[in-house]
């Protein structure tokens, strides 16, 4: 046995240089040199190590909560408009500032298209072998039909009822709660009810416990071997897919038997009953993937945002008092036990300013990715076809040029006309604006209304450490002590 181990490691040491050389030459072939017939050079920058590129440095900045530093250093060294790097095994251009954001958001399907890291492709394989980007383009319109303003209006009352029930079972009987844990339960419950009309508590708990395991695999090294974050995430997605496919099969039966006639059409029924642009219907596995993706996206986005909203309201009593005043006025305008409606949410202007300021300081994700579908030039530099581009929200969100004293929590930034165009991009922009933005707004505001009109609270760990992996979260989940108004 010992001899075999020695032989194994000896061979590994001999082969390692060859593997590194192979990786290097394979990678450099993917980075086109300046075209002979093109006068534009490639963007300035560096590609770092073979395959790894500058990914480790980038992830280090992300996990430290200072992803803007990754951009700032390279803007100063290479170009304030665009620079070259290598992330996630891909040659990548970073287009900087609001000008870069506007360019990428306005050239969707003309020069660029959405791109997902290989980790996402491995976790969510499509039934016909097409990429997630192509599949999502086909189904986006179907999802937007229900997730845009007109589609979400009818869910306000239902969502308020779910929140009030949640408050009764999880808040009113407690003196202390862990915000992160209770918000997780709330967001998963809400997505299950709105997207799939699931109200079975045990099933909601199973889905919620699985969804949180996906997050770690999104930016993981795409190596699927036992023990890796990617392997755990893939196993989780398979389990979730089986669970959601069972819900889909039952819904098909219910639709055939007309059992859903009295129910408002949720996203699941809409995806089952509506054909794509090409006249084809989605497979059960593809519908499951899209529903899981939406649930995971909502889980990641909303958990952090709502948790940090409660954190800042505890830290800034004057902000809390203004939110309370706004929400009490809305509550007093309604009959006892009357549920919120769309017009009530439109009145929550200051509350939404608070949520937006949280989204500015703590964006709900690391940013979005695009892929060049043709050669094009930007700021005098060639972006070759196949290159990837990365939009990093902190590049503008924490830039004092666009947000003076960017580390200061100040909801008044969003009063009046608000920030300059393309400087505030937590949900993307242009035709690729996140389809769930209205859903997210409803979930956040309904939560704020119900909690603020019932409680004040104080943090039990005043200077609790914030971890980022890759989404910011409190090390201990933000435990708070509740003080009911009555």
From Swiss-Prot:
EC number: 1.14.14.120
The entry's keywords: Heme, Iron, Isoprene biosynthesis, Membrane, Metal-binding, Monooxygenase, Oxidoreductase, Transmembrane, Transmembrane helix
Induction: Up-regulated by methyl jasmonate (MeJA). Induced by A.niger mycelium-derived elicitor, thus improving ginsenosides production in adventitious roots culture. Slightly induced by Tween 80. Influenced in roots by soil water potential, and in leaves by temperature, rain and relative humidity.
Pfam families, alphabetized: p450
A single Gene Ontology CC term: membrane
Binding-site list for heme: 434
Entry comment describing in which tissues the protein is expressed: Accumulates ubiquitously in all organs of plants. Mostly expressed in leaves and flowers, and, to a lower extent, in roots and stems.
Membrane topology of the entry: Single-pass membrane protein
Family affiliation: Belongs to the cytochrome P450 family.
Summary of the function given for this chain in its UniProt record: Component of the dammarane-type triterpene saponins (e.g. ginsenosides or panaxosides) biosynthetic pathway.
Protein name: Dammarenediol 12-hydroxylase
Source organism: Panax ginseng (Korean ginseng)
């Amino acid at each position: 046995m010992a001899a075999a181990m020695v032989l194994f490691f000896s061979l590994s040491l001999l082969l390692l240089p060859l593997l590194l050389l192979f990786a290097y030459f394979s990678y450099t072939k993917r980075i086109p040199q300046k075209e002979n017939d093109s006068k534009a050079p490639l963007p300035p920058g560096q590609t770092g190590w073979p395959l790894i590129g500058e990914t480790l440095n980038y992830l280090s900045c992300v996990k430290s909560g200072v992803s803007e530093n990754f951009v700032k250093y390279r803007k100063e060294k290479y170009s304030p408009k665009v620079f070259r790097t290598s992330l996630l095994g891909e040659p990548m251009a970073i287009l900087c500032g609001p000008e870069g954001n506007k360019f990428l958001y306005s050239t969707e399907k003309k020069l660029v298209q959405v791109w997902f890291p290989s980790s996402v492709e491995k976790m969510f394989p499509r039934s016909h072998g097409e990429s997630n980007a192509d599949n999502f383009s086909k189904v986006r319109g179907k999802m937007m039909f229900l997730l845009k303003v007109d589609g979400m209006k009818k869910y306000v009352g239902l969502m308020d009822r779910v929140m009030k029930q949640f408050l009764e079972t999880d808040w009113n009987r407690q003196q202390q709660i862990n915000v992160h844990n209770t918000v997780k339960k709330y967001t998963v419950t809400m997505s299950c009810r709105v997207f799939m009309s699931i109200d079975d508590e045990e099933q909601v708990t199973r889905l919620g416990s699985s969804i949180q395991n996906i997050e770690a695999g999104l930016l993981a090294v795409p190596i699927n071997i036992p023990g890796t974050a990617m392997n755990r995430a893939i196993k989780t997605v398979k389990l979730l897919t089986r669970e959601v496919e069972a819900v889909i099969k039952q819904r098909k039966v219910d639709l055939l038997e007309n059992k859903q006639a009295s129910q408002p059409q949720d996203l699941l029924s809409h995806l089952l009953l509506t054909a794509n642009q090409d006249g084809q219907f989605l497979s059960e596995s593809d519908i499951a993937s899209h529903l899981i993706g939406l649930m995971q996206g909502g889980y990641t986005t909303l958990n952090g945002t709502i948790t940090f909203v409660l954190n800042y309201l505890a830290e800034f009593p004057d902000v809390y008092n203004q939110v309370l005043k706004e929400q009490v006025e809305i509550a007093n305008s309604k009959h006892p036990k009357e549920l919120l409606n769309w017009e009530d949410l439109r009145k929550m202007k200051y509350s939404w300013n608070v949520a937006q300021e949280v989204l500015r300081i703590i964006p709900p994700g690391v940013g979005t990715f695009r892929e060049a579908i043709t050669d094009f030039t930007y700021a005098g530099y060639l972006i070759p076809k196949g290159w990837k581009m990365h939009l990093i929200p902190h590049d503008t969100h924490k830039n004092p040029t666009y947000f003076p004293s960017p580390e200061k929590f100040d909801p008044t930034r969003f009063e009046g006309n608000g920030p300059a165009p393309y400087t505030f991009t937590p949900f993307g922009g242009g035709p690729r604006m996140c389809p769930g933005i209205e859903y997210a707004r409803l979930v956040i505001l309904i939560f704020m209304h119900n909690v603020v009109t019932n409680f004040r609270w104080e943090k039990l760990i005043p200077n609790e450490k914030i971890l980022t992996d890759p989404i910011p979260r409190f090390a201990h989940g933000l435990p708070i002590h509740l003080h009911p108004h009555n």
